């Protein structure tokens, strides 16, 4: 009996280690998202998908934004190009080789804020060839490590298609409960013209000082970007690979709304009784899908207003890469 019990315990331990190894298997992910001109008359939801940024992995901000350390007083941005003098105030975020040590999970705390350009380029990549590290977090790869060149060239030749985002990264795959979504955003920032809910901005404080009720001045709050494409992509293992998309594509249009008034003076009751007129409006077009996929296969998520091409590839696991980054053989990580 004791021997059978010992065998059973050993089997359970082996299975648990096997499941853990499978759950932590690393894969390479490549994503291409494009907008297409459509004559679709489909009615889209009035409310955009809520963009969750409190628990996501952000691989894009450290590349396209200027990292600013939040301090009691205004500080200069921590540039992404190494400059010892310019970055002396934020040296704790820099490695000795000049590369940024900003954690892609840093937006899960209040340590790092970013200033962004008005338009984000479609091609997102690291400055050089990158590889994941054992027990590390997802890592952005260079554009040269991607494999979608011919696909992108073919789709770009189709009339009405416009590239929004192309990026490649490596990440460990975990169960759904342990997975953390990847933040995807791209295109134009509409925050200077529209609110997140789509309403046209009539009067805006921007970053100028404004007077409060007792006559003193306070700074207007920082305006969060309203990106043309924004949302998350979650990939996880549950015997098979699954992807979950929660993306908004924002497009300028027109909508019957109460006549616009001064944002500072309008009341809810007044806006409800005001006559409706055709008003500029920022539409929110959702791409929400949950799909089971197979590794190595190229999958296309179709939509009337956009398209998404994704491939999840098996790769040499980080421990093997660290020993020989030039290895040509691919280590098998399971029948996914």
State what each model feature region is.
Residues 2-8:
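Sec-dependent signal peptide recognition
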Residues 4, 27, 155, 169, ...:
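Aromatic-enriched hydrophobic runs in primary sequence
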Residues 10-11, 21:
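Cleavable N-terminal signal peptides
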Residues 16-18:
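N-terminal signal peptide c-region/cleavage motif recognized by signal peptidases
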Residues 23-284:
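Extended, low-hydrophobicity segments enriched in charged/polar residues
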Residues 275-336:
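Long, compositionally biased interface segments
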């Amino acid at each position: 009996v004791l021997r059978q019990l010992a065998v059973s315990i050993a089997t359970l331990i082996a299975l648990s280690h096997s499941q853990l190894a499978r759950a932590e298997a690393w894969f390479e992910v490549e994503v291409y998202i494009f907008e297409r001109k459509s004559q679709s008359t489909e009615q889209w939801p009035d409310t955009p998908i809520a963009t969750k940024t409190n628990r996501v992995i952000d691989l894009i901000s450290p590349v396209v934004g200027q990292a600013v350390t939040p301090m009691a007083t205004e500080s200069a941005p921590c540039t992404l190009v190494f400059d010892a003098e310019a970055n002396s105030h934020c040296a704790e975020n820099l490695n000795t080789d000049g590369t940024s040590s900003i954690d892609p999970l840093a937006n899960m705390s209040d340590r790092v804020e970013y200033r962004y350009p008005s338009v984000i380029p479609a091609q997102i990549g690291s400055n050089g060839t990158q590889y994941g590290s054992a027990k590390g977090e997802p890592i952005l790869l260079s554009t040269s490590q991607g494999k979608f060149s011919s696909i992108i060239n073919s789709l770009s030749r189709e009339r009405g298609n416009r590239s929004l985002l192309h990026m490649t990264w490596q990440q460990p795959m975990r169960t759904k409960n342990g997975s953390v979504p990847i933040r995807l955003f791209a295109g134009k920032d509409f925050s200077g013209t529209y609110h997140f809910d789509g309403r046209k901005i009539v009067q805006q404080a921007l970053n100028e000082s404004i007077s409060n009720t007792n006559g003193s001045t306070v700074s207007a709050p920082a305006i969060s970007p309203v990106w043309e494409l924004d949302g998350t992509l979650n990939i996880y293992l549950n015997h098979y690979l699954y992807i979950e998309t929660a993306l908004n594509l924002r497009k300028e249009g027109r909508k019957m709304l109460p006549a616009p008034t001064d944002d500072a003076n309008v009341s809810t009751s007044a806006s409800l009784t005001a006559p409706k007129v055709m008003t500029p409006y920022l539409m929110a077009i959702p791409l929400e899908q949950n799909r089971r996929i197979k590794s190595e296969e190229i999958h296309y998520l179709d939509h009337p207003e956009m398209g998404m091409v994704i491939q999840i590839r098996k790769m040499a696991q980080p421990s093997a890469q660290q020993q020989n980054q030039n290895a040509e053989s691919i280590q098998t990580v399971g029948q996914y």
